[in-house]
């Protein structure tokens, strides 16, 4: 091997060592001057520049228009709900006091604070990482051809990757806003849930006044102030509560009647029996002779169906016909 070839191989071996070395600044600082004083250092640089020129480096920054539109759509939604943009969350909460949007605005403020904290921490990490990469490229530029154009292109790629993470953070915040809307502001729901505290206050008053659960207008106004809701909502709540309470009591009564012992139940078909086909008031009308049986009571001075009050002979014949039905034929 010639002396020139040996020098080139030595130079390349030293370059390879840099890639395998650990981040020992002292060793790197000692190795850098040795590479630069090598007589073939400039020749290696020229070869690397020539090879780099053969690589097609597109200077056009291809923008993903669809991703950009989605990002703008997320920003618009977050600004409309006060999660992004000027911080007027406290003002919106004060304006929503006493309405059904009060708790919704409080939850939006939590989403805004979480998004701000995560974005701020991520931006700090991103800035630190970009500075580190730029410093590495600058140091490597002493030994391999790294142009300013290449550095800018690489930094733009890194910014694009970090922007994707920001997009995910915004998307997560938007999903939380959508869930809050479904929970608090969905107009398709038949009713809106009050807060746990408001429900406890209203239930406490209802149970304390169970015999007369009809609060006056003054009481409704006081309850509305305590629960941060409107007087109309208080009236609707008590109306619905009374209906549900009556239905519950009726259901419990039916279950108690069904769970009675067999000996306590009336026979099937008897007046008051659960499966009787005749109403109680007209059960006795099916057999007009039933009212002539001994012991049957009827209004004084009134004979049912214009019969006499009691005829023993007719009753004896009737009972005998029931006992011997074949003899009457």
Curated annotation (Swiss-Prot):
Subcellular localization, as worded in the UniProt entry: Nucleus
- Show the SUPFAM superfamilies listed in the entry: Homeodomain-like
For this record, an example GO cellular component is:
nucleus
**Record's keyword terms, sorted:** Developmental protein, DNA-binding, Homeobox, Nucleus
Q: What happens when the gene is disrupted?
A: Worms show no phenotype but, when also lacking ceh-20, incompletely penetrant embryonic lethality is observed.
- Any keyword Nucleus? yes
Task: Give the matching Gene3D superfamilies.
Answer: Homeodomain-like
Lineage, top-rank taxon, reads: Eukaryota
PROSITE patterns annotated for this entry?
HOMEOBOX_1, HOMEOBOX_2, PBC
Predominant localisation class? nucleus
Q: Which GO terms describe its biological process?
A: animal organ morphogenesis; embryonic organ development; neuron development
**Where is this chain compositionally biased, Basic and acidic residues type?**
250-266
- DNA-binding positions are 187-249
PBC-B, as annotated region = 93-186
Expression by tissue, per the entry, reads: Expressed in head dopaminergic neurons.
Record GO terms (molecular function): cis-regulatory region sequence-specific DNA binding; DNA-binding transcription factor activity, RNA polymerase II-specific
UniProt domain PBC: residue ranges:
3-186
Q: Where is this region: PBC-A?
A: 10-90
Q: List the residue ranges of the region (Disordered).
A: 248-275
Q: Which family does it belong to?
A: Belongs to the TALE/PBX homeobox family.
Q: Under what name is this protein listed?
A: Homeobox protein ceh-40
Organism field: Caenorhabditis elegans
């Amino acid at each position: 091997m010639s002396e020139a070839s040996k020098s080139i191989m030595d130079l390349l071996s030293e370059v390879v060592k840099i890639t395998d070395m650990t981040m020992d600044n002292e060793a790197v600082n000692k190795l850098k001057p040795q590479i630069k004083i090598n007589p073939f250092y400039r020749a290696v640089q020229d070869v690397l520049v020539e090879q780099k020129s053969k690589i097609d480096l597109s200077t056009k920054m291809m923008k993903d228009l669809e991703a950009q539109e989605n990002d703008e759509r997320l920003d618009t939604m977050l600004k409309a709900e006060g999660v992004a943009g000027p911080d007027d969350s406290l003002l919106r909460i004060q304006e929503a006091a006493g309405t059904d949007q009060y708790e919704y605005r409080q939850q939006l403020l939590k989403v805004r604070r979480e998004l701000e904290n995560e974005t701020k921490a991520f931006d700090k990490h991103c800035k630190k990482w970009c500075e580190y990469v730029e410093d590495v490229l600058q140091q490597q530029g002493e030994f391999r051809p790294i142009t300013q154009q290449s550095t800018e292109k690489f930094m733009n790629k890194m910014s694009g990757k970090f922007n994707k993470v920001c997009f995910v953070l915004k998307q997560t915040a938007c999903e939380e806003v959508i869930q809050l809307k479904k929970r608090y502001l969905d107009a398709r729901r038949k009713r809106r849930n009050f807060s746990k505290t408001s429900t406890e206050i209203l239930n406490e008053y209802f149970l304390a006044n169970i015999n007369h659960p009809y609060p006056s207008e003054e009481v409704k106004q006081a309850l509305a102030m305590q629960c941060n809701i409107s007087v109309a909502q208080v009236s609707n709540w008590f109306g619905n509560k009374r209906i549900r309470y009556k239905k519950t009591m009726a259901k419990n009564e039916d279950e108690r009647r069904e769970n009675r012992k067999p000996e306590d139940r009336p026979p099937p078909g008897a007046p008051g029996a659960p499966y009787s086909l005749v109403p109680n008031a007209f059960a006795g009308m099916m057999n007009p002779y039933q009212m002539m049986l001994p012991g049957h009571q009827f209004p004084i001075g009134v004979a049912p169906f214009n019969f006499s009050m009691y005829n023993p002979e007719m009753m004896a014949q009737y009972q005998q016909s029931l006992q011997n039905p074949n003899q009457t034929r």
